Amino acid sequence: MGSNMSFSRSEAAPAAPLPDLAATLAAPRDDAFQQLGAAFVTRLPAAPLPAPYVVGFSDDAARMLGLEPALRDAPGFAELFCGNPTRDWPQASLPYASVYSGHQFGVWAGQLGDGRALTIGELAHDGRRYELQLKGAGRTPYSRMGDGRAVLRSSIREFLCSEAMHHLGIPTTRALAVIGSDQPVVREEIETSAVVTRVAQSFVRFGHFEHFFANDRPEQLRALADHVIERFYPACRDADDPYLALLAEATRRTAELVAQWQAVGFCHGVMNTDNMSILGLTIDYGPFGFIDAFDAKHVCNHSDTQGRYAYRMQPRIAHWNCFCLAQALLPLIGLHRDAPSEDARAERAVEDAHAVLGRFPEQFGPALERAIRAKLGLALEREGDAALANQLLEIMDASHADFTLTFRHLARVSKHDARGDAPVRDLFIDRDAFDRWANLYRARLSEEARDDASRAAAMNRVNPKYVLRNHLAETAIRRAKEKDFSEVERLAAVLRRPFDEQPEHDAYAALPPDWASTLEVSCSS
């Protein structure tokens, strides 16, 4: 899992030379996304952020980029990573915003784009290249009616969850830093500005492909697909149909990603096609949430009044989004094969795309079943395992048992008797229903060769004790608004080791307080 995250100021290593870092970020690369041209990106400087200061910093993300954690103490760090100019940039090296389109809440929304994010360049380390993007860096041509700013509240949430998801083992964009400022911005109330530095190998979304398809720009569509294949899916180059292979890989990664979400009780909140990564990463942390009291119909986004993106709907929506990606790729599928006519090529492309999309359930289902089987401590595969898991989820739903603690405490259940049942049993309103299920579970455990201790250790490696519950984030945010960033640092450090006991931090694993039920997050989050 890498080295421990630390937010203490480092005395051991010298601060990184920021001018060299800035120059490296700005250096153009022939195969970088921005080299695709003006149809894809608009270059512009970030809007200056007055008197910036560091709110949070991830040592772990810094090391991934080949940077020393001492970088956060370098003079000018906050200025560089909020987008304030540190030098006179030539036009060819300016940050850029990209254009894309997409479906929002199932409706075609037309042109969207990076409305408040600017990509400032790339860093390479350990054979991988990463794009760095500043979210909240000011207005762009794609801001629509927005002011281009992010607020401290949402930036802290994205920072914490990006890193938490990584340490849960779930593919995600990363977050290097949060930079704050006292500059006021108007949302439901007056808040202050912030910028979060997001990191990913690519920020290309399904919506990028939809944009060029919808605007009938086949050359740009093909250039985009070729870029993604060349940089991120090189095995697709040798396929009989590289573009069909791209669709297949993106669909598979999406199915497996959502299975991982479901396994930890994560709700994204706004699974629009412009929020879907072509690399199968969790991207765009807004009104997300980890389920506390289990409810399969749980909706974490207060703006989602119809429940389109409810927990139970996420697999179906992900599949639907892959259909949107497939539609955008249809003009490319089959171009490498001989066809008697364009109509014949197009007809075959539809058939091939449907075949790829038809595999989504058989990719998602087994991925989730494997994850749940591991969460239940079942090393062997048996025919009734899915039914056993579904019965557990049903009684959890009926009792609104805490999702994270239920699976964590199941490790204490013995295959021999009920003496270890109490911690998990106490989470259920209907104790009789739990007892009936526990007897079935014990019977199933008796078929396993592992002893209780070995099974419990394995379960604790996949069932986190700590997740980013909304009330934990809210506490850190409230303190940060008072310029006390210690809780952001402390919470991030706890979430860095989600599977470890960390008994000194038991309070972070407790059931949410009553006031947590009043918290709401929405698209403005």
Curated annotation (Swiss-Prot):
GO terms for molecular function: AMPylase activity; ATP binding; magnesium ion binding. Pfam families: SelO (PF02696). ATP binds at G113, G115, R116, K135, D147, G148, R198, R205, D284. InterPro entries: SelO. It catalyses: L-seryl-[protein] + ATP = 3-O-(5'-adenylyl)-L-seryl-[protein] + diphosphate; L-threonyl-[protein] + ATP = 3-O-(5'-adenylyl)-L-threonyl-[protein] + diphosphate; L-tyrosyl-[protein] + ATP = O-(5'-adenylyl)-L-tyrosyl-[protein] + diphosphate; L-histidyl-[protein] + UTP = N(tele)-(5'-uridylyl)-L-histidyl-[protein] + diphosphate. HAMAP family: YdiU_SelO. This is Protein nucleotidyltransferase YdiU. It comes from Burkholderia mallei (strain NCTC 10229).
